[in-house]
Each structure stands twice: as C-alpha cells, then as structure tokens.
C-alpha cells in the first residue's frame, strides 16, 4: 500500500493511455500525470512511440512549471519509465520512483480508473469525429478537474489549487454558480 501524500503534487502517478485513434496531428496516446493528493490530472496528447527524453520535456513544460518537482512518482513498467535516462533524471532530482506491479491495483489503481474514465469521456465527446480527440483534450481535462470526486469530497481544482476556476457557464449564469457554492 502506498503512503498517502500530505499535500498537493508531493506524489504523482504517470501513465500512458494508448489505443486511441490517430489524429490529424499524428497523436494516438495521452500522457497522464495525476496528483495523488488532489486527484488533479494533467493530460498531454502525444504519439505512442514517444521516447523518455520527450516525455521528460512534456513533464517539465506541463507539470513542473506549475507544481514543482514531486517527491515520488508512481508509474507502470512502460519502457519509457524504465530507461536509464528516466531513472538518472529523477535520481539527480532526488525523486523516488515506484513501479506498479501487474495485478496489484493497490500500487496504482487510481490511475487505471481515471484512464478508463477519460477514454470513456473522450469517446463520448468525440463520437462524431473520433480523430479529433486531441483537440478536445484540454476541455476534457478541465471538466475532469472540476468534477466532484467522492474519494476527496470535492473537486481537484479546489483541493489542489484552493479555488475552482470559472467556466463560461459561471459567467453567463452567475446566479447558478453562487447557488452551487
């Protein structure tokens, strides 16, 4: 069993969601980073054949610039996460790497559950145009992070950032937004 983090972005999970249709941009995979404390997710469209160096670039551009270096990272045994480059990088940054074990969901079950949910949302959101899923990914990410999660009793934005960003509906219907609070 993994220890529970005490603050946002102290411990994260990383995974790749593959098996998506190739888009006009050539993307067929989503690199997922999930904060284990707030359940906030960062999702980046990419190609399934991405290498460890490119994965680290996405991480630093999409996660580190906003949340800093985590103390620990949980990932599956994808070759991108097993490379010498990847291990050396995190060792230099004093970040502990933990590899999940197949058939032991307690090591990283939340990531797999979130992955299934995101694939389902992407398929629903893009049912008429399945090869444009990467263009809707930012909206799916925002919706996911704004949704109530029973395991934390709130939404990831509130738990991870201390506030919930406004949406167009909040601006268009301010009465509805204040009633929800």
Can you annotate each of these PLM segments?
Residues 1-2, 16-21, 30, 60-63, ...:
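Generic recognition of flexible, low-complexity loop/linker segments
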Residues 17, 34-36, 46-49, 93, ...:
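Structured beta-strand/turn binding interfaces of compact recognition modules in eukaryotic regulators
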Residues 3-6, 16-18, 38, 48, ...:
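Short, flexible loop/turn elements at secondary-structure junctions
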Residues 44-65:
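Active-site beta-loop-alpha junctions of metal-dependent nucleic acid enzymes
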Residues 7-11, 40, 56, 69-70, ...:
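Domain-scale segment recognizer with a strong primary affinity
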Residues 20-22, 45-51, 127-131, 181:
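Short, contiguous acidic/charged loop-to-helix segments that flank catalytic cores in large enzymes
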Residues 6-41:
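An active-site-proximal beta-strand-loop segment
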